[in-house]
Amino acid sequence: LGLETKQRYTFSVQKANNGSSNPTLVYIRGVAMTAKTMDELVSLCKRRGFIYQSNELYGGLQGLYDYGPLGVELKNNLKQAWWRSMVYDRDDVEGLDASVLTSPKVLQYSGHEDTFTDPLIDCRSCNSRWRADDLVELRCPSCNSEDLTEPRPFNLMFKTNIGPVDDGKSFAYLRPETAQQIFTNFKNVLDSTSRNLPFGIAQIGKAFRNEVTPRNFIFRTREFEQMELEFFVAPGTDEKWLDFWVQTRLKWWVDQGIDPKNLELYKVKNDELSHYSKTTIDIMYGFPHGLEELEGIANRTDFDLGSHTKGQTELNIKS
């Protein structure tokens, strides 16, 4: 089971209703500051030291943000609360802090090289590019042209060279998610802790995705943090544990002070599931611009361990 908490969605919004005109409230040192629009929220967060545009001195980089004095404290508080709840307060979870740079083989076996894509459309008139599923109609949002290309897959993973020689072979990816190193370290953790099922491995860290169209402030960015738990269970008990974690995580968000009326569970449709998932339940929050995912809880079955151990008998893992 994979629990992926999307840190980028949870920095400061305290109250909002989906589709309503209710303002967003940001609490700063005990004073409620009202932001009625996303632009006002962005401006307020900058003035008060929550979030700045990254590299703003040189024009900024789209989809990248820096957290200021108040922002970093708020992020740290949230991460510490999550870690305490998921690791320290439980006797069946171990921690991990894995490398950001990831071997291509890891993402080949996991299926990311083939499937971690977004549908990309080009405008032939102004040369702008858009995610196909972001377009309300087949018309360029920049120039209003209807002369668009057919959608094609665009890989979201960042590549970087390893070592001094750029020969096209010695490269790695910046990890697009925090889950895969948990699976590749499964046997290491098992051997060093002598754990028995069920047990989990938790990790907090950066992930990187070369988003086609970053948007809505920090709601879709190219660099962000995830709080991840992979919980390993005996065959046949997966649905029971999925329900347990959905209820546990929903209660955790309420315990952080979120109004339950603003939370909603969404079962992802079969044709929308990630390539690794049998069932996914998203915990959604009603932001001013609509429902957005706070956390995804997925029944990954044995897809990941099975993928990484297939043809690698030296790992001696049966999933």
Residue locations for each model-derived region?
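Leucine-biased recognition of intrinsically disordered, low-complexity hydrophobic segments
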Residues: L1-L3, L25
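Short, low-complexity segments with poor structural confidence in diverse proteins
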Residues: E4-Y9
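Short, Lys/Arg-enriched N-terminal segments with co-localized hydrophobic residues
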Residues: T10, K15-A32
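TRNA-recognition modules of translation machinery and tRNA-sensing kinases, especially anticodon-binding
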Residues: M33-S319
